[in-house]
């Protein structure tokens, strides 16, 4: 495993712990600058890895990239996804009602306003927004191939409740959130019809997927992320436990499921027409 990968996982697990960088550095007996250097891929001793693992409450092997990584906070999970996406050449996903990497600035704006109404921890909000901004920018620069399957039932709820479905917000903001949701689904229909190179969508018309998952294929390996966290949820939410792994048995099993669902899903003109039908039925007027 490369030192940069150990550093990436160290940062993700630090965010998962909820501890500040200076707090971890103090307990470890190093400077905060030294901790940041570890996160950037500087050489780290095995005894330091052991002590970090104890502090972060993970196994040393997991910190070294061997085994399954578990995350109970959206912040740490999406940071880990960001790291893997930056090296991925292909992304296959059973996703939220949208594919975040190609959403509009309006999506980010309405979500930021909804989160600000609910979450008092400004630093948490800033960290969350920085991660998502970095994910979008990385996609813009690298343009990995992306195949996304969307559940029809989740799209219906998205149109009825709007961006930030699980976030408590004022009636006025909820109305705006529904308008943005309708705009995003309309954009996906347009993207399906435009058929841009390297970007494909399909619609799971008769399937309510039980698991959102992402397969990210890089030059050296494929990573699987199983995700209970929607990209439009509050960073303070605690709704489940996600996992990230490169274990071949997990990756291959999910790849087989994704291939079957892709073959059975609604694509092209039929998918675009179905999305516009859902807009007519469920979007705010």
What are these regions (language model features)?
Residues 66-97:
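Short, charged recognition helix plus adjacent turn
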Residues 40, 50-51, 61-65, 78-79, ...:
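Alpha-helix boundary/capping detector
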Residues 30, 49-51, 56-59, 74-78, ...:
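Alpha-helix boundary/interfacial micro-motifs
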Residues 93-284:
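Hydrophobic protein-protein interaction segments
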Residues 31, 45-46, 56-59, 70-73, ...:
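Short, surface-exposed, charged/polar-biased interaction segments
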Residues 1-77:
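Basic, Lys/Arg-rich alpha-helical nucleic-acid-recognition elements, primarily the DNA-binding modules
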Residues 10, 20-21, 38, 87, ...:
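Residues at structural and domain junctions
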Residues 6, 25, 31-33, 88, ...:
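Short, well-ordered helical secondary-structure segments
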């Amino acid at each position: 495993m490369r030192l940069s990968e150990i550093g990436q996982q160290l940062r993700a697990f630090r965010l998962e712990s909820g501890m500040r960088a200076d707090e971890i550095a103090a307990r470890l007996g190093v400077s905060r600058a030294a901790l940041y250097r570890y996160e950037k891929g500087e050489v780290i001793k095995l005894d330091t890895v052991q002590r970090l693992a104890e502090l972060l409450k993970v196994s040393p092997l997991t910190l070294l990239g061997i085994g399954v990584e578990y995350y109970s906070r959206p912040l740490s999970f999406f940071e880990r996804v960001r790291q893997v996406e930056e090296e991925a050449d292909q992304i296959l996903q059973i996703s939220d009602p949208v594919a975040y990497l190609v959403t509009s600035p309006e999506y980010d704006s309405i979500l930021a306003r909804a989160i600000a109404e609910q979450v008092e921890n400004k630093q948490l909000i800033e960290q969350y927004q920085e991660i998502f901004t970095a994910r979008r920018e990385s996609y813009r620069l690298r343009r990995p191939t992306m195949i996304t399957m969307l559940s029809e039932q989740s799209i219906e709820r998205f149109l009825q409740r709007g961006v930030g479905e699980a976030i408590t917000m004022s009636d006025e903001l909820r109305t705006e959130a529904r308008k943005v949701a309708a705009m995003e689904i309309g954009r996906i229909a347009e993207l399906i019809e435009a058929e841009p190179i390297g970007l494909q969508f399909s619609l799971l018309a008769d399937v309510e997927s039980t698991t959102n998952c992402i397969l990210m294929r890089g030059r050296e390996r494929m990573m699987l992320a199983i995700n209970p966290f929607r990209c439009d949820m509050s960073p303070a939410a605690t709704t489940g436990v996600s996992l990230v792994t490169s274990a071949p048995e997990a990756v291959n099993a999910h790849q087989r499921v994704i291939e079957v669902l892709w073959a059975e899903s609604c694509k092209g003109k039929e998918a675009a027409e179905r999305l516009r039908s859902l807009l007519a039925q469920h979007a705010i007027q």
